[in-house]
């Protein structure tokens, strides 16, 4: 298991609310909580930036973190990430924030300490551009959306 440096920015973490942890041995994501001052109403169409009370430092340029939505919030309530996916670079050290967007038809209350997103570590491969005049021919070529087959 990879060590991940973290700072607790909200003293309720570790006291009222647990540190993020994997729910099972097969879990890929660590749940992030809404460390709000009070329960907050998110109206339909509204987007709100939610603090998590944590900052992390990955440090390894071969890793990054993704902030992803929790499936239940999106499916049951229409609460998804405003930026769809949050990318945390290995050299970022600021507070993890979650952009919540209510794409549903009814207002939703985000409770203090509610699990609102998940953090997943992923490998990173950095590339450099090699400029060419032409590409080697491929089966797909320049075919865009819908060109790899139907159903």
Curated annotation (Swiss-Prot):
Keyword Hydrolase attached: yes
Cofactor: Mg(2+)
Entry EC no(s): 3.6.1.23
Keyword Magnesium set for record: yes
Gene3D superfamilies reported in the protein's UniProt record: 2.70.40.10
Signal peptide annotation: none
One Gene Ontology molecular-function label: dUTP diphosphatase activity
Disulfide bonds, paired cysteine numbers: none
Matching Pfam families: dUTPase (PF00692)
Purpose: This enzyme is involved in nucleotide metabolism: it produces dUMP, the immediate precursor of thymidine nucleotides and it decreases the intracellular concentration of dUTP so that uracil cannot be incorporated into DNA.
NCBIfam families the UniProt entry points to: dut (TIGR00576), PRK00601.1 (NF001862)
Family: Belongs to the dUTPase family.
Name by which UniProt lists this protein: Deoxyuridine 5'-triphosphate nucleotidohydrolase
């Amino acid at each position: 298991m990879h060590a991940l440096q973290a700072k607790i920015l909200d003293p309720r973490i570790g006291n009222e609310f647990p540190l993020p942890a994997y729910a099972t041995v097969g879990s890929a994501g660590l749940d992030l909580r809404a460390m709000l001052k009070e329960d907050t109403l998110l109206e339909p169409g509204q987007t709100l930036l939610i603090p998590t009370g944590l900052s992390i430092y990955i440090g390894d340029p071969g890793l990054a973190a993704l902030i992803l939505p929790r499936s239940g919030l999106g499916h049951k309530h229409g609460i998804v990430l405003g930026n769809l996916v949050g990318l945390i670079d290995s050299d970022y050290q600021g507070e993890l924030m979650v952009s919540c967007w209510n794409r549903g038809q009814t207002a939703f209350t985000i409770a203090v300490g509610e699990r609102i997103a998940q953090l997943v570590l992923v490998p990173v491969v950095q590339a450099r551009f090699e400029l060419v005049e032409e590409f080697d021919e491929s089966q797909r070529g320049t075919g865009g959306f819908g060109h790899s087959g139907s159903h």
